[in-house]
A protein has these predicted regions:
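Boundary/entry segment of secreted carbohydrate-active catalytic domains
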Residues: 1-33
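Short, well-structured secondary-structure segments
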Residues: 25-38, 50-69, 93-94
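Surface-exposed substrate-engagement region within the catalytic domains
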Residues: 22-26, 79-95, 99-157
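Short beta-strand/loop segments at the ligand-binding rim of alpha/beta enzyme cores
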Residues: 2-4, 59, 125-126
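Single conserved hydrophobic/aromatic residue that forms the stacking wall/gate
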Residues: 158-164
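Active-site beta-loop-alpha junctions enriched in small/polar residues
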Residues: 8-11, 33-35, 65-69, 99-101, ...
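Acidic (Asp/Glu)-rich catalytic clusters
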Residues: 15-24, 43-58, 81-90, 144
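Glycine-rich anion/phosphate-binding loops
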Residues: 42-45, 68-82
Length: 164
């Protein structure tokens, strides 16, 4: 069974929940922020987007854009995301977004494991997001087999067949 969803970052206004539903969107994955737990590294639209989705009864999940290159960096980013989630447990889980070229050469398996273990300890469903090329070229450690994968395959055609 296919379920139609979108991922968003920044404020989605003037888009409304009715617009999303009219487009057939059944769930949304919202960006919480990026990097470690420092002021200003939260997504500018996260809180408002979640409020809009919850009011409309649209289930959501969340992703965090990573710059972590170590296990401790992944843990720090998880703590940042947990603070931004503020106790919420999104139905569509939380996702560790690994696609920053600046992280290449770092301990990517350790960063992912630190993030994912921290989120699981908080009672959240967690997975790892990356593009097809990242999965094929950089995220090849068996550590990644412990977590669900969200594989981004971009398309320029609306309604094209792709997975997320």
């Amino acid at each position: 069974m296919a379920v139609k969803g979108v991922d968003i970052s920044g404020p989605i206004a003037p888009c409304t929940a009715a617009d999303l539903k009219a487009a057939g969107v059944e769930f949304v994955i919202c960006k919480t922020g990026f990097g470690s737990d420092y002021p200003g590294q939260q997504d500018s639209g996260f809180a408002a987007n979640v409020k809009l989705l919850e009011a409309a009864g649209i289930p959501w999940g969340a992703y965090h854009f990573s710059y972590a290159t170590t296990r401790n960096g992944g843990i720090s980013e998880a703590k940042h995301m947990l603070r931004l989630l503020n106790g919420r447990k999104p139905l569509y889980g939380v996702w560790f977004d690994m696609e920053a070229n600046s992280t290449l050469g770092g301990d990517l398996p350790g960063a992912a494991e630190g993030f994912c273990e921290t989120m699981e300890a908080a009672g959240l469903y967690v997975g790892v997001y990356a593009s097809t090329s990242w999965w094929q070229n950089y995220l090849t450690s068996p550590i990644f087999d412990k977590y669900d994968k969200w594989v981004d395959r971009k398309s320029t055609r609306l309604n094209s067949s792709h997975q997320r």
